[in-house]
């Protein structure tokens, strides 16, 4: 590769968006530049970067990122920056967000070939995928106890430190329009990180991290309303019996998702048995197998605290990202971790520490602050279903601007939407827990509408 040419390009890019940058920034970007991913298509016309950003020197915590810029023909310098986070907690944004949902490539069944996605979101924005917290994916800590003591608070703080340091490495993105997007348990991560950025931007007229808003999908939001909505969805869709429904309502409403009572765990186990061999993340989709997703579905804790959707494509990602040539191309696993790369960390998820009962106070604060907030939901997800999301949104008591209406894609209903003062709610018909995986075109329309601050199309 002609690194002198890359150096010139990077210098020109940085100089157009900020004053002269020290050469160390350019050197760091050159170090992180992905020249070519094994198996990628030949017609890739966008820049990619990946590597590590240290968030705690003393304990040796470093988070792995993957930046996928917009195609050169779409002028990436004019496009916003979007941080994507997956949930779990303990699941990888590389495994799900990048490889299965919104990234430019999907991994082929041979675990070797990358295929281009027609509705990749980097056509609309520069995408930054972060594996967080330490212990997830390629992100690591040199202090083993960190993997057993992490929780919401540390995850938010480390993610914020990551952003501060990352923007120093990529100063051309400073002051750029910036959004945070995620799904599932990122329903905690996204608003919590947004709150931190908003608070620490106070006093700056032109903050480097120019946060404009956030969007979450099938998001864990409020324990009480998530319980009500989830159990109601199970019962309304014929997934559980009347007696188990009443048992769940009696045993589970008054406890937290982190510390369920024995009675609640019994009720959840009964619900799991009654649901049988279905894919709870997409109830009308044939499950890939009867092992991984189902064994982790309830697992003695609440369903929305488990891992993300487990289609067969995850198997291909596990093969691909554990290849040494792939890790070398991504500048990943530089410390030679003692465990293989996995889509979700059992340790991080099982030993999760703090998890507040509700994100609604953060919503109220950031709505008042004027941030753009969108919430979307695939309507065939039984893990964090649309009913749970609607109960949580209703609890905010927001004034309605545009009442519930069907939105359209080429004359067909793509879902439904309601616009509130300070928040937009969108459903995607036929989509499961991972909306962009099941309905990529409709998810693309949703993302475009969000970025453009336009309501979902009515015709």
From Swiss-Prot:
Annotated active site? 184, 381, 433
Major localization class: secreted
User: What are the protein's UniProt keywords?
Assistant: Carboxypeptidase, Disulfide bond, Glycoprotein, Hydrolase, Protease, Secreted, Signal
Q: Name one Pfam family in it.
A: Peptidase_S10
Q: Which GO terms describe its molecular function?
A: serine-type carboxypeptidase activity
List, alphabetically, the GO terms of the cellular component aspect: extracellular region
Annotated signal peptide: 1-20
Listed as disulfide-bonded, the cysteine pairs are 91-344, 252-264, 288-312
* Single Gene Ontology BP annotation: proteolysis
Q: In which tissues is it expressed?
A: Ubiquitous.
Report the family membership.
Belongs to the peptidase S10 family.
This protein's name: Serine carboxypeptidase-like 27
Which lineage is the organism of this entry classified under, starting from the top rank? Eukaryota, Viridiplantae, Streptophyta, Embryophyta, Tracheophyta
């Amino acid at each position: 590769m002609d690194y002198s040419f890359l150096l010139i390009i990077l210098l020109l890019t940085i100089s157009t968006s900020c004053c002269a940058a020290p050469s160390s920034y350019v050197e760091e970007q050159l170090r992180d530049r992905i020249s070519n991913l094994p198996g990628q298509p030949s017609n890739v016309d966008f820049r990619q970067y990946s590597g590590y950003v240290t968030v705690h020197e003393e304990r040796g915590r470093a988070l792995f990122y993957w930046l996928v810029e917009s195609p050169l023909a779409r002028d990436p310098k004019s496009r916003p920056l979007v941080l994507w986070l997956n949930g779990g907690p303990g699941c990888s944004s590389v495994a799900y967000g990048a490889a299965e949902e919104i990234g430019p490539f999907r991994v082929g069944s041979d675990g070797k070939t990358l295929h281009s996605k027609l509705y990749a979101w980097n056509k609309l924005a520069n995408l930054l995928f972060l594996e967080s917290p330490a212990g997830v994916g390629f992100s690591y800590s040199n202090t083993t106890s960190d993997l057993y003591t992490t929780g919401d608070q540390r995850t938010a703080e480390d993610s914020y430190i990551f952003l501060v340091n990352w923007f120093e490495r990529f100063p051309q993105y400073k002051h750029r329009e910036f959004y945070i997007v995620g799904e599932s348990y990122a329903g905690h991560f996204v608003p919590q990180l947004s709150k931190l950025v908003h608070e620490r931007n106070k006093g700056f007229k032109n903050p480097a991290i120019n946060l404009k808003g956030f969007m979450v999908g099938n998001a864990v939001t409020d324990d009480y309303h998530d319980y009500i909505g989830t159990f109601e969805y199970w019962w309304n869709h014929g997934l559980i019996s009347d007696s188990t429904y009443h048992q769940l309502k009696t045993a589970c409403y008054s406890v937290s998702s982190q510390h369920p009572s024995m009675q609640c765990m019994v009720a959840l186990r009964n619900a799991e048995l009654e649901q049988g061999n279905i894919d709870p993340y997409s109830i009308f989709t044939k499950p890939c197998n009867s092992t991984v997703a189902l064994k982790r579905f309830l697992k003695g804790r609440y369903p929305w605290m488990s891992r993300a959707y487990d289609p067969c494509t995850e198997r291909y990602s596990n093969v691909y990202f554990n290849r040494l040539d792939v890790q070398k191309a991504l500048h990943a696993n530089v410390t030679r971790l003692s465990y293989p790369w996995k889509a979700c960390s059992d340790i991080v998820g099982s030993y999760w520490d703090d998890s507040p009962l509700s994100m609604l106070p953060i919503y109220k604060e950031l709505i008042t602050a004027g941030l753009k907030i969108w919430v979307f939901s695939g309507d065939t997800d039984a893990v964090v279903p649309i009913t749970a999301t609607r109960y949580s949104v209703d609890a905010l008591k927001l004034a309605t601007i545009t009442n519930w209406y069907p939105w359209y894609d080429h004359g067909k209903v793509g879902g439904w939407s309601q616009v509130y003062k300070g928040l937009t709610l969108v459903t995607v018909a036929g989509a499961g827990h991972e909306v962009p995986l099941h309905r990529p075109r409709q998810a693309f329309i949703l993302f475009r509408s969000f970025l453009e601050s336009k309501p979902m199309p009515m015709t």
